[in-house]
Regions:
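A hydrophobic/aromatic-rich effector-binding and dimerization subdomain
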Residues: 4, 110-113, 117-134
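Tight coil/turn sites that cap or link beta-strands
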Residues: 46-48, 83-84, 92, 102
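Short, conserved beta-strand element in jelly-roll/cupin
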Residues: 40-46, 55-74, 110-113
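Hydrophobic small-molecule pocket/channel-lining residues, especially in calycin-type beta-barrels
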Residues: 49, 57, 69-70, 78, ...
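Acidic/histidine-enriched, glycine/proline-rich intrinsically disordered or flexible terminal extensions
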Residues: 126-175
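A short glycine-rich, His/Asp/Glu-containing loop-to-beta-strand
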Residues: 14-53, 59-60
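Ligand-binding loop in jelly-roll beta-barrel domains
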Residues: 91-117
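Short acidic-glycine-tyrosine-enriched beta hairpin
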Residues: 9-11, 33, 62, 76-94
Length: 175
């Protein structure tokens, strides 16, 4: 809530919820609306969830673990952090995050510069529109490639992905 003073207030449990399988997004601070140079997004992680490895060309992501054990891989750096743990994933590095534990996890992401928070909403809308379609999967859809290009995002399948999925007993990435 902006009280006309430039102060943005988001109470506990508030924010724009964006449904994504296994890895949701709750936008806490929207960069353009709130006049901030950053965006803040909370991500819940269901047990067994891993994000699709990806690379940002425009943003750095700073993650703070709030609950559970969350694994991070950014290029050659791999770490599992508990509550209070912090990691920066610089733009240009292929990275993924996963729930490394047996309980739901949650992180806060500070994304700089802001604007990327809109990707989650647009991805959710695309996944909803593609649900039930037969034929090529979401990643083969032209709309998916257009969305990734719009946000300077590339997806990949690095050689470390299968090892992480096996070691932590994860489900495969959802998109």
């Amino acid at each position: 809530v902006d009280h006309g003073t430039g102060v943005a207030v988001v109470g506990p449990g508030e924010g724009e919820e964006v449904p994504l399988p296994g890895f949701g997004a709750v936008v806490k601070l929207r960069s353009r609306r709130d006049g901030a140079e950053v965006a803040i997004v909370e991500h819940p992680f269901a047990v067994g969830t891993i994000t699709t490895p990806h690379r940002h060309t425009r943003e750095d992501e700073h993650s703070i673990v709030l609950a559970g054990e969350i694994g991070f891989r950014s290029d050659d750096t791999e770490v599992v952090l508990g509550p209070g743990g912090y990691i920066t994933k610089p733009r240009g590095q292929m990275h993924a995050m996963w729930n490394a534990g047996r309980e739901p996890g949650r992180i806060i992401e500070v994304i700089t510069p802001g604007g990327f928070e809109n990707y989650f909403r647009e991805l959710s809308e695309l996944m909803t529109a593609q649900a039930g379609h037969t034929g090529p999967g979401l990643r083969e859809a032209p709309e998916f490639a257009e969305l990734a290009a719009k946000y300077g995002l590339t997806y990949g399948a690095p050689d470390w992905l299968d090892d992480i999925v096996v070691r932590y007993g994860l489900n495969g990435p959802t998109h």
